[in-house]
């Protein structure tokens, strides 16, 4: 397969980074290059798919195909090619308004690239999924509650779980109370979108970076497994959920102005 890669690169007059080699004389033969690079790629060489993604965008290539180019790029990314992962992530983010869940796919690829040391991916993630700063609306009071917290976990386990999510993923009050737990878990991130039930809700992502965060989310998802998270479910509408939260915070002695901080 290495020989196939080298042969394909030779015909393309390119290096493994997809750059044109000025030291190679003669015109490129992209058709032959595609043949050999495809064979190398099908045997698991990510570099072959990455170079193919470059060839298919060449205006001088008679079989130029932007869709095929992106398909090759994704195959390279799937095989762990960091530059391809970065490029897939940025492409998905640019197209987030045209394709459903493109922001989720963008975060996935950028996390993969970041794990391989990409500073560009890390910077992009900071813009795409910044850590929320919801302020203190009472979610931290439960940590010092002791016996009342244990009582809440017994009497209102769903509310207790939502407070736990709020602390770990910096959720606002409205996000914590209205989050669709089933749809939020995307594996690598939490998709927070309460816009359908809250006028000020904005879609955003919270990255899952640690094993502890993953473990907590798994526990919460299991708890909500057979629960309808919608307003017709057992938790009721936003006002009903908010009332239960306020009653609990009042028991803890949380100042009323804290309860009414903007959600």
Predicted features, each with a name:
Residues 18-36, 62-72, 99-109:
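Structural signature of tandem alpha-helical TPR/SEL1-like repeats
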Residues 133-169:
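Basic, Lys/Arg- and aromatic-enriched nucleic-acid-binding interface segment
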Residues 164-188:
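Short, charged phosphate-coordinating catalytic segments
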Residues 179-216:
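Conserved tyrosine-mediated DNA breakage-rejoining catalytic core shared by Y-recombinases
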Residues 209-263:
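Active-site/catalytic core of tyrosine-dependent DNA strand-transfer enzymes
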């Amino acid at each position: 397969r290495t020989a196939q890669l080298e042969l394909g690169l030779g015909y393309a007059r390119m290096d493994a980074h997809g750059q044109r080699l000025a030291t190679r004389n003669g015109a490129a033969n992209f058709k032959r290059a595609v043949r050999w690079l495809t064979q190398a790629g099908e045997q698991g060489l990510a570099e072959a798919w990455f170079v193919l993604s470059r060839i298919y965008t060449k205006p001088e290539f008679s079989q130029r195909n932007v869709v095929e180019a992106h398909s090759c790029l994704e195959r390279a990314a799937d095989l762990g090619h960091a530059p391809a992962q970065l490029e897939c992530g940025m492409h998905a983010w640019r197209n987030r308004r045209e394709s459903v869940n493109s922001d989720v796919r963008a975060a996935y690829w950028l996390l993969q690239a970041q794990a391989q040391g990409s500073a560009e991916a890390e910077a992009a993630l900071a813009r795409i999924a910044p850590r929320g700063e919801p302020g203190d609306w009472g979610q931290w009071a439960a940590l010092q509650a002791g016996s009342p917290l244990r009582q809440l976990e017994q009497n209102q386990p769903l509310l207790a779980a939502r407070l736990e999510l709020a602390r770990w993923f910096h959720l606002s009050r409205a996000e914590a109370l209205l989050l669709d737990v089933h749809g939020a878990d995307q594996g690598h991130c939490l998709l927070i979108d309460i816009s359908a039930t809250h006028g000020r809700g904005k879609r955003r992502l919270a990255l899952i970076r640690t094993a502890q965060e993953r473990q907590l989310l798994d526990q919460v998802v299991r708890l909500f497994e057979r629960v309808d998270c919608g307003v017709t479910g057992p938790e009721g509408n936003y006002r009903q959920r908010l009332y239960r939260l306020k009653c609990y915070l009042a028991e803890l002695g949380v100042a009323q102005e804290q309860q009414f901080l903007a959600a």
